[in-house]
């Protein structure tokens, strides 16, 4: 009989830990949470100090029964769930569900699933940290109140199956605000000018960029300005004003936090946040390797910290010295650090548990995506302990009368950390002409080249950039980024096309209603402050029920007001002019998961359906037929000709009936402005003036 029972969340984690502890321990899994708030009711006794009413999760009864049998056999129980709020709460629920009050029971935590870390945690066992549990309870209760009270309003005012969330709704607003910025952005024309400079003895010319005159930067806004400048410059003598040679050092990147791992995995590996976290969980809990059995390959994956333990730091530096040479070992004093007030800084950064276990050594034993993620984590960590990269730089200033041009070039002198982390490698721009040129070099103008540009709107959010923005604004924590994005996609509030996230018509409707009825809930500062309060609960500075108590009255007041004042945005069956070709009835407008469509009112006898096209009252500039609002397969709105495919007109911006006064072309709406669709024209006017 095993004298010691260790309870973890997952079978994979149990298998890995069992190997380390031997026969005197039995390691079993709870398969995640065993108790939660009920699904059928709010499960919070508002009149009794917001006491949660936890119940056994459906399907977990058999697991608990088996765990109780194991508890009876054991002399001591160790609760070894994950080292964060959620893990602490699972341990607390297990403690009560298994009635461990009269049993020798301890809480153990480890940042990595290795033999040394697990055995050390048993020596340093402790009681359950109720501050951590209370922080999780506060988050769970707040999220339940928001979801349970607001979601039914969305059901009644828009459609069933929708949801609101404390973090989810703010993230949706952030995406909506960005889409509005993009829609209202008015592109401005500007020009750049460069000069090809001939240097004696060099086959290829230098490309020097116009920077301005002696008084500073000069901006070029039109072709006319450029032509005037070019005519002046053709009559000027080009001379070298100065040549500066130097060095530039590039610091290695910090090791990964949850946020930066999700961002880099999205950019480098094209992985969603959800997939990144799933694979990282596998790497953390244990992977089977030949000769080693099941072993945890990385440290805990939910962290805000870039801190590294002294032991891991020393081991990695030793590995770098042996594999690459001592000159590649980074200076401890030059290692970048980050300061964070967030509570998760108690953890280390995400790193390999053994830096000597290189990706090449285990490539054949891991599935492709698991290997790619491990490789990314390993290279980032090893690079963070390596020396800076050193660049040789040359900067040349050129004078042409009163005007200035500049050339800057660099090449790698010492690779440093880029030997491992090739993502940060910069292409060498040093050519023969740059090496030959001095202040006394006689140079000659070969050609002046002008290029037209247009200012670009802010970029659409990607999963990576949204995670970065949420973190910068203090919205959510490492455990919430991926589930938040997953929920928004699942509810079809947003869609993803070529990595970009776009708001859908449904997402706009939900956000508009949240802004009208619950402005506090979708306020970025309010949500960030709430996260700070939850951190304060974890630190023992604030009672969790006080946080909920202060939040609840205003929330209920907003709900009551919204129920009375918010108008429905869903439309009853609207009869269209479209006639059903199968039965002759006028078709009606219906709402489905992807928005509006036309259906025959004779259903179920007649099941005919058609796409719904909303006319905007503007004629197609190509064929004269109606322009209609359409959607891509993923739900993104655009405007196209009803005569498609015979006519291929389309526009992402809403076309206007007003014609451009400059070129006669069609114009599109950009917020309060009308802008000519022809960028070469660029005519802009106010919408109000054209009414």
Predicted regions and their residues:
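Metal- or metallocofactor-binding catalytic centers and their adjacent structured scaffolds
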Residues: 216-254, 441
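Conserved short loop/turn motifs at secondary-structure junctions
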Residues: 2, 82-83, 159-163, 245-254, ...
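Basic, low-complexity terminal or inter-domain segments flanking catalytic cores
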Residues: 2-4, 16, 23-25, 151, ...
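Core structural elements
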Residues: 139-149, 167, 197-199, 248-260, ...
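Intrinsically disordered, low-complexity regulatory segments
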Residues: 1-140, 149, 212, 220-223, ...
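Short acidic, hydrophobic short linear motifs in intrinsically disordered regions
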Residues: 240-243, 251-265, 292-301, 457-469
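C-terminal or mid-to-C-terminal helical accessory/interaction module adjacent to the motor/catalytic core
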Residues: 113, 117-195, 246
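Alpha-helical scaffold elements adjacent to nucleotide-binding pockets in ATP/GTP-utilizing enzyme cores
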Residues: 16-20, 66, 89-97, 117-121, ...
């Amino acid at each position: 009989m095993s004298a010691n029972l260790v309870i973890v969340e997952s079978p994979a984690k149990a298998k890995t830990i069992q190997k380390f502890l031997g026969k005197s321990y039995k390691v079993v899994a709870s398969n995640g949470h065993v108790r939660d708030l009920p699904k059928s009711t709010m499960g919070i006794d508002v009149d009794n100090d917001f006491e949660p009413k936890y119940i056994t999760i459906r399907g977990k009864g058999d697991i608990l029964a088996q765990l109780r049998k194991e508890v009876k056999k054991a002399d001591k129980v160790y609760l070894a769930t994950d080292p964060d709020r959620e893990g602490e709460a699972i341990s607390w629920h297990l403690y009560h569900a298994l009635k461990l009050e009269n049993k020798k029971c301890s809480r153990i935590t480890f940042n990595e699933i290795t033999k040394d870390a697990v055995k050390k945690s048993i020596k340093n066992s402790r009681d359950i940290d109720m501050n951590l549990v209370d922080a999780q309870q506060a988050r769970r209760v707040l999220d339940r109140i928001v979801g349970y009270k607001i979601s039914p309003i969305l059901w009644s005012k828009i459609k069933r199956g929708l949801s609101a969330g404390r973090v989810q709704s703010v993230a949706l607003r952030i995406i909506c605000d960005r889409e509005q910025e993009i829609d209202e952005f008015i592109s401005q024309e500007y020009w750049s000018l460069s000069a090809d400079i001939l240097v004696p003895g060099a086959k290829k010319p230098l490309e020097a960029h116009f920077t301005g005159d002696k008084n500073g930067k000069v901006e070029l806004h039109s072709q006319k300005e450029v032509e005037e400048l070019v005519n002046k410059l053709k009559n000027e003598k080009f001379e070298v004003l100065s040549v500066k040679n130097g060095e530039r050092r590039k610091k290695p990147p910090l090791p990964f936090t949850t946020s930066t791992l999700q961002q880099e995995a999205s950019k480098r590996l094209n992985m969603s946040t959800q997939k990144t976290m799933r694979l990282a969980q596998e790497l953390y809990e244990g992977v089977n390797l030949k000769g080693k059995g099941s072993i945890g390959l990385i440290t805990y994956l939910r962290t805000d910290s870039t801190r590294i333990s002294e032991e891991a730091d020393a081991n990695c530096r030793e590995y770098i010295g042996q594999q690459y040479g001592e000159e590649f070992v980074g200076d401890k004093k030059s290692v970048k650090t980050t300061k964070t007030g967030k509570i998760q800084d108690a953890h280390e950064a995400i790193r390999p548990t053994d830096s000597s276990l290189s990706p090449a050594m285990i490539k054949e034993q891991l599935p492709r995506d698991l290997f790619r993620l491990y490789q990314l984590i390993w290279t980032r960590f090893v690079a963070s302990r390596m020396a800076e990269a050193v660049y040789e730089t040359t900067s040349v200033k050129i004078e042409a009368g009163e005007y200035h041009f500049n050339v800057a070039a660099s090449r790698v002198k010492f690779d440093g950390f880029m030997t491992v982390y090739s993502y940060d490698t910069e292409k060498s721009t040093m050519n023969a002409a740059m090496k030959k040129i001095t202040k006394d070099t006689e140079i000659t103008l070969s050609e002046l080249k002008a290029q037209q540009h247009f200012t670009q709107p802010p970029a659409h959010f990607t999963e990576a950039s949204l995670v970065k923005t949420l973190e910068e604004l203090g919205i959510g924590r490492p455990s919430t980024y991926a589930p938040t994005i997953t929920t928004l996609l699942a509810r079809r509030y947003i869609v993803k096309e070529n990595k970009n996230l776009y708001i859908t018509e449904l997402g706009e409707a939900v956000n508009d209603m949240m802004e009208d009825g619950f402005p506090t809930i979708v306020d970025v500062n309010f949500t960030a402050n709430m996260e700070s309060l939850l951190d304060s609960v974890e630190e023992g500075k604030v009672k969790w029920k006080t946080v909920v108590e202060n939040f609840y009255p205003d929330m209920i007041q907003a709900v009551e007001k919204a129920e009375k004042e918010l108008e429905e945005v869903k439309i009853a069956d609207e009869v269209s002019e479209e006639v059903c070709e199968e039965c002759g009835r006028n078709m009606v407008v219906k709402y489905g998961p992807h928005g509006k469509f036309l259906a025959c009112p004779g259903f179920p006898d007649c099941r005919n359906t058609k796409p719904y096209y909303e006319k905007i009252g503007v004629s197609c500039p190509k064929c004269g037929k109606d322009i209609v609002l359409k959607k891509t397969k993923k739900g993104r709105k655009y405007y196209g000709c009803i005569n498609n495919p015979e006519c291929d007109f389309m526009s992402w911006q809403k076309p206007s009936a007003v014609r451009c006064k400059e070129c006669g072309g069609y114009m599109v709406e950009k917020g309060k402005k009308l802008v000519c669709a022809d960028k070469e024209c660029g005519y802009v006017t106010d919408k109000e003036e054209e009414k």
